[in-house]
């Protein structure tokens, strides 16, 4: 099952091509802009109502902001930055990259509810057949604690001579 927050107009039923059977859609104007606490509260309501025991996020900036709050709210074990789907053959074990990617740790999670955030490209998705059932979910949505009053996008480029930090990389030459 999946959760879609906000007034999304795209064809979310098409997520069924990736194995999602049911999508709980929570439409509310308060969900227009990300407020991690508000999102965590709404996702907790959906998870509890559907009886979810595993909640999966992408390890994006949004996932990194929401998943720890949801973990605290649901008293759930959290593994952030997983590099593979969980192994459930003997409990619930998640593989995670550690020491700047130089090693891997297998983390066992024993709480009744588990939350993981998957690193990009942790597993390959392949489109198949099917459509998901989209169900409207009525959640209590708190007023956001932060209000977005405007969005100013940066334009143009910083010239190389005016940049505060310049990062350069290369293979170099083996000789003069």
Regions found by a protein language model. Give the residues of each.
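N-terminal glycine-rich FAD/FM-binding segment characteristic of electron-transfer flavoproteins
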Residues: 1-176
